[in-house]
């Protein structure tokens, strides 16, 4: 993702984007099928336990996979002498769909021009809303409730979901957003696709999976710093910038929303066009490469301001 240098207009929660992001390929694999119900429950409980300890696995999906293995390895390495990850004792809770939830669900226009004319980029289905709210894959929510992948869900319907702190798009409150840094810093590995928050002594505070750039549009290595944090950003699509690296007047400005190409939160760096941001499709986050930015799930990216702020150092390796 290429982004213009920060403007004063950022106070209006507007970020001018100059190219689009693709997925992030970092050798990530996962099982294509669910195992037994017992195995799914064990995996969900393990993934949940890691997430609650600030070792994100991305989507909670109940399957074996690289992201869970990496988070487990990092957890064990950072807790020498401690027991291995203990699966969460209460991995599930329930959610009852409310009439007001449907305000955030609707069809998206199929073209850039059409989406640019929309006021808000909603979820495309209630299953998508519920899954993102509980940090889960849509396939897992469907599996847990005996549903097809394109179910018709209605207000009043109760679903079994992972027992996490819910990501509520209707009450998005990014705690600490825009405050000054507190001494913590960020370390990103482009090769492994990981982002770690460390304290002044180098102690690990939080761990996340991320996707980074390709050989053609590499995420820039070096020492940078955070210069802004923008909840619910807009997105500027410019084909000339994407293909030729030249800003043009032929562009589309996408409105905010969970399906905005940069998700629900932008953390800008003092490297023109580069930032850490959310993503509308968490299930495809690690299947390709970005155009230089660092992408996270929407529910992960909004937690960053709890640990780092404006002025915090970001080391990209």
Residue ranges: model-predicted function:
Residues 171-279:
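Gly/Pro-biased beta-strand-loop elements
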Residues 22-25:
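Bacterial signal peptide processing site
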Residues 252-317:
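C-terminal soluble interaction/assembly domains
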Residues 34-69, 97-135:
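Primarily a LysM-type cell-wall glycan-binding module
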Residues 51-55, 73-81, 132-136, 142-149, ...:
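Sec-exported extracytoplasmic/periplasmic mature domains
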Residues 18-20:
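C-terminal motif of bacterial Sec signal peptides marking the signal peptidase cleavage site
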Residues 1-10:
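Bacterial N-terminal signal peptides that target proteins for export
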Residues 66-104, 140-177:
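Extracellular LysM carbohydrate-binding repeats and other cell-envelope/extracellular binding modules
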């Amino acid at each position: 993702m290429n982004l213009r240098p920060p403007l004063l207009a950022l106070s209006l929660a507007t970020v001018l984007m100059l190219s689009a992001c693709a997925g992030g390929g970092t050798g990530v694999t996962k099982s294509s099928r669910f195992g037994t119900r017992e195995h799914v429950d064990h995996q969900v409980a393990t993934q949940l336990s890691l997430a609650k300890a600030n070792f994100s696995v991305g989507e909670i999906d109940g399957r074996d996979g690289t992201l869970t293995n990496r988070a487990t390895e990092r957890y064990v390495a950072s807790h020498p002498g401690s027991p291995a990850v203990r699966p969460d004792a209460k991995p599930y809770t329930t959610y009852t769909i409310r009439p007001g939830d449907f305000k955030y669900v609707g069809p998206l226009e199929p073209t850039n021009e059409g989406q640019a004319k929309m006021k808000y980029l909603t979820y495309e289905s209630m299953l998508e809303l519920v899954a993102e709210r509980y940090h889960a894959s849509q396939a897992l929510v469907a599996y847990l409730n005996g549903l097809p992948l394109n179910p018709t869900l209605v207000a009043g319907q109760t679903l079994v979901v992972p027992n996490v702190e819910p990501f509520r798009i209707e009450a998005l409150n990014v705690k600490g957003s825009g405050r000054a840094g507190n001494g913590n810093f960020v370390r990103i590995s482009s090769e492994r696709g990981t982002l770690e928050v460390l304290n002044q002594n180098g102690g690990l505070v939080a761990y996340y999976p991320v996707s980074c750039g390709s050989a053609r549009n590499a995420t820039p290595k070096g020492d940078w710093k955070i210069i802004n944090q923008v909840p619910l950003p807009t997105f500027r699509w410019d084909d000339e910038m994407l293909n030729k690296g030249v800003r043009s007047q032929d562009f589309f400005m996408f409105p905010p929303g969970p399906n905005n190409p940069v998700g629900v939160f932008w953390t800008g760096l003092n490297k023109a066009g580069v930032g850490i941001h959310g993503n509308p499709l968490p299930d495809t986050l690690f299947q390709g490469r970005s155009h230089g930015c660092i992408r996270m799930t929407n529910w992960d990216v909004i937690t960053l301001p709890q640990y780092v702020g404006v002025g915090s150092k970001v080391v990209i390796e």
